[in-house]
């Protein structure tokens, strides 16, 4: 398999200087998004239609919620399902009926496709429509794909939120302008942003996904969309098709990124720059103070970012500009130029960007560079550690609350911690 992938690998440099690679990949699938989404939407349930491997992945990654039943499960496809010996739709209907009878608290059910369900062409969109009609109005059933075929793991959230867009209510014709923050955020971060938006004078603010399915925000031409994550391409497109307008901004990582993100929203709502600066100044100062101790530890250290989560470019901007790290290479699975238009000019001149993945070639470049820190997926971390390189799991940067002023120090600490561990082990 490695030999075949290597033979088919393509590496090219585009006129814009981005190294584009198409070869062997090393990624988690979109099912991983359930780990944080099932905690966010409190009356939703995620039913994966997949194999035992899918079940092991979700169970291992998410664990079991203490003192509560988990809000995810797997309808396991057996060999007879794959062989077409039974009607998979009948089996799915039976499982959903059992689930909803046992869990009356479920108000929103996601049928999540996987590699096996896509291979046998199981039409989960028709199943979702059929089941939604059957269990309406108490339960709404939607579907999306968490398959790992030609995707990366954060696309699971994008697919989930894109599935919600068609069922968002339409705002009234005379609705006043509203702000929709898109992307799953920890509740504590969401609450911080709500307070800051209110202090800026923006009070008509909603978040997608909401904490409960009954709180789906109304959208329309007067809705301004502010992305909290850079990997929400399908969701942004679906919102724009419904008349929403996206605000271009850097992403809220670090003090600088958060300030620019909030300022872009304020500008779209006509808030004066003087008021924005007065409001944000003490918050920026607090973030600066938190970052100072980590800057002393990390400044001048060299970092290599493998393509994995799609947040690599905002992370690189934060590490270079606010922490003083040197960027050896910044890889990203997909380079969405429109969504990253405010980020790309903020990277240091001459930064090596790579889009896509050819893991063997990237490993060769990483080994040759011998950076102080490697940000990569779990599958690469242990082998690189065995070779004497210090690593940081990129997936941890998705699980952990890192957005906003108050979390700037926590974000920096995530990069300082593995280097500190390495120092202690060397003593």
From Swiss-Prot:
It catalyses: chlorophyllide a + oxidized 2[4Fe-4S]-[ferredoxin] + 2 ADP + 2 phosphate = protochlorophyllide a + reduced 2[4Fe-4S]-[ferredoxin] + 2 ATP + 2 H2O. GO terms for molecular function: 4 iron, 4 sulfur cluster binding; ATP binding; metal ion binding; oxidoreductase activity, acting on iron-sulfur proteins as donors; oxidoreductase activity, acting on the CH-CH group of donors, iron-sulfur protein as acceptor. [4Fe-4S] cluster binds at residues 29, 54, 115. Its EC number is 1.3.7.7. Keywords: 4Fe-4S, ATP-binding, Bacteriochlorophyll biosynthesis, Chlorophyll biosynthesis, Iron, Iron-sulfur, Metal-binding, Nucleotide-binding, Oxidoreductase, Photosynthesis. Binds 1 [4Fe-4S] cluster per heterodimer. The cluster is bound at the heterodimer interface by residues from both subunits. GO terms for biological process: light-independent bacteriochlorophyll biosynthetic process; photosynthesis, dark reaction. InterPro entries: LIPOR_BchN/ChlN, Nase/OxRdtase_comp1, Protochl_reductN. It comes from the Bacteria. Its cofactor is [4Fe-4S] cluster. Pathway: Porphyrin-containing compound metabolism; bacteriochlorophyll biosynthesis (light-independent). SUPFAM superfamilies: Helical backbone' metal receptor. PANTHER family: LIGHT-INDEPENDENT PROTOCHLOROPHYLLIDE REDUCTASE SUBUNIT N. Protochlorophyllide reductase is composed of three subunits; BchL, BchN and BchB. Forms a heterotetramer of two BchB and two BchN subunits. Belongs to the BchN/ChlN family. Component of the dark-operative protochlorophyllide reductase (DPOR) that uses Mg-ATP and reduced ferredoxin to reduce ring D of protochlorophyllide (Pchlide) to form chlorophyllide a (Chlide). This reaction is light-independent. The NB-protein (BchN-BchB) is the catalytic component of the complex. This is Light-independent protochlorophyllide reductase subunit N.
């Amino acid at each position: 398999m490695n030999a075949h992938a290597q033979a088919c690998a393509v590496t090219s440099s585009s006129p814009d200087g981005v190294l584009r690679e198409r070869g062997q990949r090393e990624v988690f699938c979109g099912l991983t998004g359930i780990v944080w989404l099932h905690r966010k939407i409190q009356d939703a349930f995620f039913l994966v239609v997949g194999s035992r491997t899918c079940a092991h992945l979700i169970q291992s990654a998410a664990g079991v919620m203490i003192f509560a039943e988990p809000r995810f499960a797997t309808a396991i496809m057996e060999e007879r399902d794959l062989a077409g010996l039974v009607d998979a739709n009948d089996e799915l209907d039976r499982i959903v009926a059992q689930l909803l009878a046992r869990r009356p608290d479920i108000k929103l059910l996601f049928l999540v496709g996987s590699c096996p369900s896509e291979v046998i062409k199981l039409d989960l969109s028709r199943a979702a429509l059929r089941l939604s009609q059957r269990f309406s109005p108490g339960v709404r059933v939607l579907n999306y794909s968490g398959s790992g075929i030609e995707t990366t793991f954060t696309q699971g959230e994008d697919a989930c939120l894109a599935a919600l867009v068609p069922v968002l209510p339409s705002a009234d014709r005379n609705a006043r302008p509203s702000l929709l923050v898109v992307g799953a955020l920890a509740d504590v971060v969401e609450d911080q942003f709500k307070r800051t938006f209110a202090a800026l004078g923006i009070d008509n603010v909603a978040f997608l996904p909401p904490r409960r399915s009954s709180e789906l925000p109304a959208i329309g031409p007067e809705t301004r969309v502010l992305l909290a994550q850079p990997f929400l391409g399908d969701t942004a497109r679906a919102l724009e098709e419904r008349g929403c307008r996206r605000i271009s901004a850097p992403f809220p990582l670090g003090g600088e990124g958060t300030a620019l993100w909030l300022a872009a929203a304020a500008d779209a709502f006509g808030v004066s720059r003087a008021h924005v600066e007065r409001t944000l100044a003490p918050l920026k100062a607090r973030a600066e103070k938190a970052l100072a101790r980590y800057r002393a530890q990390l400044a001048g250290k060299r970092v290599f970012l493998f393509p994995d989560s799609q947040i690599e470019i905002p992370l690189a901007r934060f590490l270079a500009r606010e922490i003083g790290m040197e960027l050896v290479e910044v890889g990203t699975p997909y380079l969405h130029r429109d969504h990253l238009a405010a980020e790309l000019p903020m990277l240091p001149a001459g930064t090596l960007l790579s889009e896509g993945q050819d893991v063997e070639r990237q490993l060769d470049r990483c080994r040759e560079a011998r950076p102080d820190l490697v940000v990569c997926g779990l599958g690469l971390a242990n082998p690189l550690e065995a070779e004497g390189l210090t690593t940081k799991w990129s997936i941890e940067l998705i699980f952990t609350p890192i957005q906003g002023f108050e979390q700037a120090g926590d974000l920096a600490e995530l990069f300082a911690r593995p280097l500190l561990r390495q120092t202690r082990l060397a003593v």
